[in-house]
From Swiss-Prot:
This is Protein TIC 214. The gene is TIC214. InterPro entries: TIC214. One of its GO terms (biological process) is protein transport. It holds the Pfam family Ycf1. Involved in protein precursor import into chloroplasts. May be part of an intermediate translocation complex acting as a protein-conducting channel at the inner envelope. It comes from the Eukaryota.
Length: 1913
């Protein structure tokens, strides 16, 4: 049984233990390190391959294994690791040994001394082999696969507890792998040696010494490989002797800069965060040290980087006196003058570099600023005579060696050192045990080491790991017990009847004084967080920082209130001290210096105390002032005394932060641009000092001078070569130079790097091209190859199509090509050509002496072309014309030749002149541009009227007016572009000859055709003559009476013969082949040729047939004559044969023509039928609909109630769809319908009276109807029953069945209030038809649009487009009969449904699916009878504003977006009045008419239900309200953008971002009221003080008048309780009045400030724009940039010419010079600049500010379903009402309450809520994560028990409606919260580490709870 249990039960566990054991893991990782091949493998293999002997093999193997053993030992032994891991050590080992190695190879005889025996180990060469393998094993691993395998052992060391066993086992594993590898190598070598086929080579046999030569060659090859490997390794650090030295900033300069910065910081006011922890100074030190890991410190840290900065002219002495010096601040110490910096402490390398992780610490970064050394070190340096240590000179750690980029800060002069790694390994306590953390703050590690070193005097015994863990467990238990007892005590007090507020734990507050018990205000309390915290101004005045208090008692106790400071202050130094009488000024200066030095405690961490001193000082009663000055220089409270022994103590009012110094580089580097700027500035100021040399590599560029403005001798010096860096006293000779910088268009990977640093090693990036913009790894070459192969395939396909095009039988004439694909191909071709040009230019620029060669070739070709080739061609041409007896063209040709100009240009194409060469053109390059290039023509064209072809040629000629000369004398359109085809001289000659030949051919062809026609006519005449003869012959045969019977018999065949002849004639006309209807494959010329050939064939056949018939006719006539002699039977048989022959011939002809006849006949029938079907019904329908429409229009025009202005539609057009739609929609106006059912006749008072009398309708019946978000078919029946039963209409007049229009009334009403689809009556009355037509041109078809007839669309597309617009307009104006009454019934019915709000049972009927903005929330004011519900005509802008805000969830009811709502260009002078607005309602006076109050501002987005256009009144409008945005919108999910730049863009921008393809981006900026707004801006900028006061008074008077009018208006109100209702308009006017008063107050404040005065309107707008560019960015257009550069190039040429007319006109015609850019107006506004395309504004994508709780939930990983994150209105939240849509959405704590809650309800259902949140979290963590049980940390069974989840489900299944009971819901909430403590998990980091830094949050092993299994949560 035991054996079975061992086999079955424990076999798996035993296997797992063996696998996870340290020995097995070490063997595995050690074996893997074998595959990491290093440089030493070369020597190991060399000893075996070269057959150097057994001793060499043994020594090589021994050295190799010894070196590897040393590497493994260095992993465990830190000193050896530091010795072998430092680059200094490796460099010292490599450089001497390389020389020794090569010397030993060359001088082998020198090393072969001693015994001559081969087996002797005394041979020095064998020892060198051992040493070589030993040393090179210590180097980094070089070859396959990577050094990661060698570092696997180091990585696993952090996870292993038994490290020594792991190192030993890993070495054994490596040894096993090495033995196997060497065995394999030995087998391969022996196989090669034994294989005779390899060794027995003919060459080897013929040469005896070839083997020896081969061995020596292999040795040399291995030496070369070894040398390359070593050099590659040494490339890590550049040679210090070759490296360029950087400019080091002197100490005096840095002090001066620091003092200037300190003065600036004192003068400026800065904000600082007042959150400070008051627990301990150690805690603050840790936090500040942790904050040091940031790479880019904030400006706050930058300004406080050296708090002890004082004026440099100030001198402080310890005795209290103050003297002034000129340069530096000095302190007398032991009779020596030393600088202030020498009193700073400095870390010694020998003291604090013991830890393994020190090499990555921040101490290296601080050493550049810790400039002080000890006195002993300074003396040694002075004796040796070196300014710096030798190691520092050779290996300067302060300079840049790695390829870092210089990050310059505006505040700091020197760059900040941010090269330290983010990983720092150090031991820390975690759960009471020491563990290695790789993100430990290095500054905190340094601080702890200092504290431990100083505390070693106090503590003699260190705690073990077990003691630390037990101590941690006991502390946690004690904390848990204390918290539990406190909670129990509070519960007991609560049970006794105490009040809950007294029992609850209060929030900890910070008090000023213990006696008075007064706490700091919430704004300044550092213990508070959240909304109570604020930011205060920090004043640097001395009065607020310190306070002098004189006291003679209690000074000793107050000295030692900071004991940590006593451990980290400076070392004890001997000071000379002299007592002087008390001096207040010296004391204040001394205290200032001491106070400012306190903030450097984190850096100046050196103690001055010893344990014996502390024991003595505690026993002293009187302090000796001399000892105090020696030891208490930097105490927390600095104490001094006067002669009267009165102690003066400096007391802090607030706690000073412990700051640290930011590590900065000593070297002050400048870029090349800064260097040139400083150089020019010094030249202007005539300073002799040369600027510092630039140390930063800039982009490769060359300065090209394009123009030199000289006042004198300008024409005498055509080739100026002035130097920019020198200035002369004679200003007449030198002038201002205008230069451009030409950058190299190639890859510049060394840009912004520091001179002297090595280049970045890109092992995986290969550059194989001259110009490679996107350098990538060779791994992606396959993708590039695929792209190239695709391109090659496309080119091959095109060539194949060209070759085999003639082989294709049928090719369509029109080939449809994809335009987008064509454009893409053209773009690719342009890009390729551009890349080729750049490659060629950079090749010429990079090759040595290439520019000089190219320039000389260009100049030579230019001279040969201008003065040799072209004149010879002109002479040859004119001589040829004279020989051909034509007029010569000497004058014209030489005139064009003189017009050609060869302009010298710079390398990038900037034109200079014909005679002026650019500076340094042999070095920088040159281009030659040919203007008006001469082209030789055989003859001159006549100056006739230009045709279309002539215009094209003229345009092409203008484009060919310039070119660039290539190296080979060709012409190119662009520099380095492909040579273009020059116009051929002989091409027009050959074309002229070709045209003449074609003319001759055409004439001959015409002659042939005419001859054919003539012959055809002649043959026709011949046939007519033959027929006439036959007729005469037949006539004479009829006259003979004897032959009457025979003739009768013979007559029939003669008739048949005649018919045959006639049929032959008919055949002559019909034998012409009918051309095929498929003529698309033939061109017109081919058709003509084919017809002519057919005609010739037919004529020839007809002639042959006629000749045959002639012969046949004569033969038959003979037979007929001789037939008198024959019998009748013979005649009959002959006649039958003739009949059969004729019948056969006709049948053949009929069969042959039958197919074409049937086809043509059917086509003609189909065509006729189609035309009939189209025309006849169309005409009938047209007449029918026109008659119906006339009747309807007549009935509508008779209606007196329709007084609105509706444009008449065109009566002549055919309205198919609109007429049908109007007929159905206006069916209620039919004559058959009774007048009682026209609801427009019912008055509002009557309907109100009938509704008030009915008791049938109940609101709960409409609850389900209104809660539905979709229009189901059964809704209309429900609404019909509800509103049909109250008998609003008389029973007598009501029919049995309602008409269709009345049944659909409520459905149309619901649809009319849909967000984006207005009803037809609303749409018809908005704006006149002109605007509708203009607007609908940009609209899209929505889901209700209809399609027109396809035939109409094909006939005329423009007419169809105009008809479609009119149809949409007509469809919107269908419900004309209810134009005024429809809205009133909607309002009345909704009022009635929502009346009597006292009953709160059905108060959750809040709204329909229409979502509105925050300012439109339903107030739930039950005392108000008039409410602000959504069915009263809210503007569409509200819906647009909420729907298009970023982050707001879209409404589920919105299915389609109709762009007709967005009316962006409706900016005319219209004062739109709306009937119903936000807080106004319909008012009824005595006469029954309605008065509608007007809105105070225009709203173009507001498309309300009823609008009246009144153009008589014009109201001024503010600039910031030109979009008509609503200023009362309370909630915006994006951010409040109104104070930002251009708030009018916000609403449009949100709409555009949601639908960018529908809305044009131009609509964001277009506005027709430009001039008006510009005037308003200019007026507001220039208003003086008097006008402001007058305007304010006028505005107040105007508001008072409006308020009086509104009060009069309210008097006629018929509402029941008008006094209980607030008037929103009055409140709005009060708000306006308040704003005006605030503006007046603010204007008084602004008077005191110095305001910048702008000279022009443009400056004011641009200044405002640049200040508010946070939302929009400004950039130049790329096209505009090109235009500007081309203009500059033309200007450079024009400035050098005397006659500018011809060149200027030519450049304007070519488009090189843009006149719009030349005529830049000075007073252009920003809007005009945008319109002209000079500036382009692009919106920046707004970032959303996430909720902090939401980030916490996402970080932990449990995402809550949050469909809508909009908070409920505050006033609604208090009463507990919410939107009904929120029932299916997530609930966030303290944001939304689904139920009512009492203000006195303290949520005490959970007892732990008595404690504060911080103490509560602490208690939960201590209980859940039991510190005494380790298994509880790894997995808590309580939270992983499935039974708990089931119990949760059972609990929820008890009642599905938990929201109805507040207590049940609170129970549920607090039941779920302990199981899902998300906040507790997130706060664990803060609790355990006692810090707010969350950088190590991801390092915690958080065990997540299972997800809750209920779907609705």
């Amino acid at each position: 049984m035991i054996f079975k249990s061992f086999l079955l039960g424990n076999l798996g566990s035993l296997y797992i233990k063996i696998i996870n054991s340290v020995v097995v893991v070490g063997l595995y990782y050690g074996f893997l390190t074998t595959f990491s091949i290093g440089p030493s493998y070369f020597f190991l293999l060399r000893a075996r391959i070269m057959e150097e002997g057994t001793e060499r093999e043994v020594s090589a193997t021994t050295g190799f294994i010894t070196g590897q053993l040393m590497m493994f030992i260095s992993i465990y032994y830190a000193p050896l690791h530091l010795a072998l891991g430092r680059p200094h050590t490796i460099t010292v080992l490599v450089i001497p040994y390389l020389l020794f190695h090569f010397f030993s190879n060359n001088q082998k005889q020198f090393f072969d001394y001693g015994s001559t025996t081969r087996n002797s180990m005394r041979n020095l060469s064998i020892q060198c082999v051992f040493l070589t393998n030993l040393i090179f094993q210590l180097f980094n691993h070089l070859m396959l696969p990577s050094s990661t395998l060698a570092r696997l052992v180091n990585i696993y060391m952090f996870r292993c507890n038994n490290k020594m066993l792991f190192v030993t086992s890993s070495f054994v594993g490596w040894l096993i792998g090495h033995i196997l590898f060497m065995k394999w190598v030995g087998l391969v070598v022996s196989w090669i040696r034994q294989n005779h086929s390899i060794r027995s080579n003919v060459l080897i046999r013929s040469n005896k010494y070839l083997g020896l030569k081969l061995k020596s060659a292999i040795a040399q090859i291995l030496s070369i490989i070894f040398f390359i490997a070593c050099v590659n390794y040494l490339a890590r650090l550049p040679d210090p002797s070759v490296t360029k030295k950087l400019n080091e900033t002197s100490k005096t300069e840095t002090e001066e800069e620091e003092s200037k910065e300190s003065q600036k910081s004192k003068e400026s006011e800065e904000e600082r965060d007042v959150e400070k922890e008051t627990t301990s100074e150690t805690k603050e030190t840790k936090q500040e040290q942790e904050g040091s890991t940031e790479q880019d410190p904030s400006p706050y840290w930058e300004e406080k980087e050296d708090p002890d900065k004082i004026d440099e002219t100030e001198e402080i002495r310890v005795n209290g006196k103050e003297k002034k010096k000129d340069e530096t601040e000095e302190i007398r110490v032991n009779g020596k003058e030393k600088k202030k910096d020498e009193f700073r402490f400095h870390f010694k390398e020998t003291d604090y570099k013991r830890s393994p992780g020190y090499e990555n610490s921040y101490l290296d970064g601080y050493q550049d600023n810790w400039d002080l050394q000890s006195e002993e070190e300074e003396e040694e340096e002075s004796t040796l005579g070196f300014e710096k240590p030798l190691v520092t000179c050779l290996f300067d750690y302060k300079r840049w060696n790695r390829p870092f980029r210089y990050i310059k800060n505006k505040t700091f002069e020197n760059a900040i050192r941010d090269e330290m790694s983010q990983y720092f390994f150090y031991t820390c306590l975690n759960n009471g045990k020491k563990k290695i953390s790789f993100t430990y703050p290095p500054s905190l590690a340094t601080f702890s080491e200092i504290i431990e070193r100083k505390m070693s005097l106090y503590t003699t015994k260190k705690l073990t790991d077990d003691d630390l863990y037990s101590h941690w467990v006991s502390n946690n238990e004690e904390k848990k017990n204390n918290l539990s007892n406190e909670l129990i005590n509070r519960i007991k007090v609560l049970d006794k009847g105490s009040l809950a507020p007294d029992v609850l734990e209060k929030r900890t507050r910070l008090c000023d004084d213990e006696n008075e018990q007064e706490c700091l205000p919430k704004k300044y309390d550092p213990l508070l967080n959240g909304s109570y915290r604020g930011r205060i101004k920090k004043l640097e005045s001395e009065s607020t920082r310190n306070d002098s208090i004189i006291s003679a008692k209690g000074s000793l106790e107050k000295i030692w209130k900071n004991k940590i400071h006593s451990l980290i202050t400076n070392d004890s130094r001997e000071f000379e001290h002299q007592m002087d009488p008390f001096d207040g000024e010296s004391l204040s200066a001394y205290m200032t210096h001491s106070l400012t030095s306190i903030s450097k405690l984190s850096l100046e961490l050196v103690s001055i105390f010893h344990f014996e001193d502390l024991a003595l000082l505690t026993e002293q009663k009187r302090i000796d002032f001399e000892n105090q000055t020696k030891r208490l220089k930097f105490l927390f409270d600095v104490i001094t005394a006067d002669a009267n022994n009165q102690t003066i103590e400096n007391k802090f009012i607030e706690i000073e932060k412990i700051d640290k110094k930011i590590p900065r580089w000593v070297y002050k580097l400048i870029s090349e641009e800064d260097y040139l700027a400083q150089q020019e500035q010094q030249e202007e100021e005539n300073e002799e000092e040369a600027p510092l040399d630039f140390g930063i590599r800039s982009r490769k560029g060359r300065r090209v001078v394009i123009y030199t403005d000289k006042n004198q001798n300008r024409d005498q010096d055509p080739n100026p070569n002035t130097d920019n860096t020198t200035t002369e006293n004679d200003n007449s000779d030198t002038g201002e130079e205008i230069a451009l910088i030409r950058y190299a268009q190639q890859s510049d990977f060394s840009r912004d790097l520091i001179n002297g640093s090595i280049r970045a090693k890109r092992r995986k990036i290969v550059l194989w091209e001259m110009l490679q913009a996107n350098a990538h790894s060779p791994l992606f070459l396959d993708q590039v190859a695929k792209m190239v192969s695709f391109d090659l395939f496309d080119d091959l396909r095109e060539t194949m199509n060209l070759i085999f095009r003639n082989w294709i039988t049928k090719e369509p004439e029109l080939q449809i090509l994809d335009s987008e694909e064509k454009e893409d191909r053209e773009k690719l071709i342009k890009i390729r050509e551009e890349d080729e040009r750049i490659i060629i230019s950079e090749t010429w620029d990079n090759v040595m002496c290439a520019q000089a060669i190219r320039g000389c070739m260009l100049v030579t070709h230019s001279f040969i072309r201008k003065y040799i080739i072209l004149p010879l061609l002109i002479i040859a041409k004119n001589i040829g014309r004279i020989l051909l007896f034509q007029l010569s063209e000497w004058d014209e040709d030489f005139k064009d030749w003189n017009r050609e100009m060869h302009v010298k240009c710079t390398y990038n194409g900037v034109q200079l002149s014909e005679t002026e060469f650019p500076q340094n053109w042999l070095k920088d390059g040159i281009q030659i541009k040919i203007l008006f290039p001469f082209s030789l023509k055989p003859w001159r064209e006549s100056k006739a009227t230009p045709s279309t072809g002539g215009l094209m040629k003229e345009k092409k000629r203008k484009n060919d007016d310039f070119c660039f000369l290539t190296v080979w004398g060709m012409e190119a359109e662009l520099p380095f572009g492909p040579p273009r085809n020059r116009p051929s001289f002989f091409k027009p000659i050959f074309e002229e000859l070709d045209t003449n030949i074609r003319k001759v051919e055409n004439q001959s062809f015409v002659f042939k055709e005419k001859t054919k026609d003539f012959l055809k006519k002649k043959t026709g005449w011949v046939t007519k003559i033959v027929l006439l003869k036959n007729k005469i012959r037949n006539f004479f045969t009829k006259v003979n009476p004897n032959l009457l019977f025979g003739l009768k018999k013979v007559y029939e065949p003669s008739e048949n013969q005649k018919d045959s002849i006639i049929s032959n004639k008919i055949t002559h006309e019909s034998t012409v082949q009918i051309p095929s209807s498929n003529w698309t494959n033939y061109s017109p010329i081919e058709k003509k040729m084919k017809d002519l050939s057919d005609r010739t064939i037919t004529t020839r056949s007809q002639i042959e047939r006629i000749t045959k018939d002639k012969q046949k006719g004569f033969l038959t006539s003979d037979i007929n004559i001789r037939s008198n002699e024959t019998s009748c039977n013979a005649k009959r048989t002959e006649l039958q044969k003739d009949i059969l022959r004729i019948a056969k011939k006709r049948s053949i002809r009929f069969i042959r023509k039958l197919h074409s006849f049937v086809k043509s006949f059917i086509e003609r029938i189909y065509l006729d039928i189609f035309l009939c079907t189209i025309n006849i019904p169309r005409i009938n329908l047209q007449l029918f609909f026109e008659s119906i429409k006339k009747i309807l229009n007549k009935s509508i025009s008779n209606d007196e109630r329709n007084k609105e202005k509706i444009d008449e539609t065109n009566q002549n057009t055919i309205h198919f769809i609109s007429t049908i739609r109007n007929s159905f929609s206006n069916s209620n106006l039919n004559n058959k319908s009774k007048i009682y059912w026209d609801f427009s006749l019912l008055s509002q008072a009557y309907v109100l009276y009938k509704l008030s009398q009915t008791q049938v309708i109940k609101r709960y019946q409409l609850k389900s109807v209104l809660q539905y978000h979709r229009a189901y078919p059964f809704l209309k029946d429900r609404i019909k029953d509800l509103f049909g039963t109250p008998r609003i209409v008389h029973a007598k007049s009501r029919p049995k069945k309602l008409p269709i229009s009345r049944i659909n009334a409520w459905k149309n009403w619901l649809r009319g209030h849909y967000q984006y689809n207005l009803s037809q009556t609303r749409w018809s009355e908005l704006v006149p038809k002109k605007w509708r037509e203009k607007f609908n041109q940009r609209t899209i078809k929505n889901k209700y649009s209809r399609k027109l007839n396809s035939s109409e669309k094909e006939k005329n597309q423009q007419a169809h487009y105009a008809k479609e617009i009119s149809y949409v307009v007509d469809s919107l104006s269908s419900q004309k009969g209810k134009l005024k009454k429809d809205y009133r019934y909607d309002l009345l019915s909704h009022k009635y449904i929502n009346s009597n709000y006292e009953d709160r049972e059905y108060s959750d009927i809040s709204r329909l699916s229409l979502q509105i903005n925050g300012d439109r929330e339903i107030p739930y004011d039950y005392n108000r009878q008039e409410s602000d519900y959504v069915l009263v005509g809210l503007p569409i802008s509200d819906y647009l504003g909420e729907e298009y805000f970023i982050g707001v969830d879209k409404n589920s009811d919105r299915k389609y977006f109709d762009r007709r709502i967005l009316r962006f260009d409706l900016r005319k002078d219209l004062n739109i009045k709306t009937q119903i607005n936000r807080d106004t309602e319909t008012n009824m006076n005595k006469n029954g008419t309605n008065n509608y109050p007007a809105i105070g501002k225009k709203n173009p987005f507001s498309l309300p239900i009823h609008q009246e256009i009144n153009s008589s009144k014009k109201k001024k409008q503010k600039f910031f309200d030109w979009m008509g945005m609503r200023e009362e919108i309370l909630y915006r999910p994006i951010s409040n953008l109104e104070p930002w730049f251009f708030p009018e863009f916000v609403l449009r921008y949100d709409a555009y971002k949601s639908k960018p393809r529908i809305i044009s981006i131009k609509s964001l900026l277009l506005d027709s009221q430009k001039d008006e707004r510009n005037e308003i801006i200019s007026k507001t900028k220039n208003i003086n003080k008097k006008n402001q006061k007058k305007d304010l008074s006028n505005q107040k008077k105007h508001l008072e008048v409006e308020n009086q009018e509104k009060e009069d208006f309210r008097q006629v109100d018929l509402r029941p309780n008008p006094t209980n209702q607030r008037d929103p308009i009055v409140s709005d006017t009060r708000n306006q009045q308040k704003d005006i008063e605030e503006d007046s107050v603010g204007s008084g404040v602004k008077k005191r400030r110095k305001k910048k005065k702008f000279k022009s309107k443009k400056e004011a707008e641009l200044d405002f724009f640049l200040k508010k560019y946070l939302l929009f960015q400004l950039r130049w257009d790329e096209l505009l940039n090109k235009k500007m550069m081309t203009n500059i190039k033309v200007y450079c040429l024009l400035l050098r010419l005397k006659n500018l007319k011809e060149i200027a006109i030519s450049s304007i015609e070519r488009g090189e010079m843009c006149l719009d850019l030349m005529l830049m107006q000075k007073d252009l506004s920003l809007r005009e600049l945008i319109k002209k395309g000079i500036f382009i504004i692009e919106p920046i994508r707004l970032s959303r500010k996430w909720d902090g709780k939401l980030i916490m939930y996402q970080t932990i990983g449990i995402s809550l379903v949050a469909e809508n994150k909009d908070p409920i209105n505050i006033r609604c939240r208090k009463k507990g009402y919410a939107d009904e849509n929120s029932f299916n959405k997530s609930v966030r704590q303290q944001e939304k309450m689904l139920v009512d809650r009492d203000e006195n309800d303290y949520d005490l259902l959970v007892p732990e809520n008595i404690l504060s949140p911080r103490r509560r979290r602490e208690l939960r963590i201590l209980i859940c994560f039991n510190s005494g049980n380790e298994s509880a940390v790894d997995g808590n069974s309580v939270f992983y028990n499935n039974k708990n989840v089931e119990s949760c489900r059972q609990f929820l299944d008890e009642d599905k409606h938990l929201d109805t009971d507040a207590k049940k819901f609170m129970k549920l909430k607090f039941f779920l919260w302990p199981n899902y403590r998300l906040e507790d998990l997130a706060c664990m980091n803060r609790y355990w580490f006692d810090t707010t830094n969350g950088s190590r949050f991801s390092m915690l092993r958080i065990h997540m709870y299972p997800r809750f299994l209920i779907s609705w949560w």
